[in-house]
Amino acid sequence: MLNKNNILERLNDLKPFLQKEYSVKNIGLFGSFSNNSFSDESDIDIFVEFEKPIGWKVFTLEIYLEKTFGRKIDLVTKNALKEQIKDRILKQVKYV
């Protein structure tokens, strides 16, 4: 069963590949899996920062992560965060 620790461990293992293939600078977990309040229906909220813009390839990354974890992924970038929740989310992210 997925939990915070094994998601973070897997992201850490994938990080070199994600850096090479998708120009990932930082990646981390937030949301219900991060604070152990997830359910069977919960998606995995992943925060990502890129070294450079990757355009539509962000959708390929999301699909790759969904296949890797076997669960819906909500992939979020700093620019996509609404101002009202940005600080709260950024404080919650557990980076690998």
Please identify what each model-predicted range represents:
Residues G28, D45-F47:
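Short, well-ordered beta-strand segments
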Residues M1-N26, S34-D40, F50-V96:
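Catalytic core of pol beta-like nucleotidyltransferases
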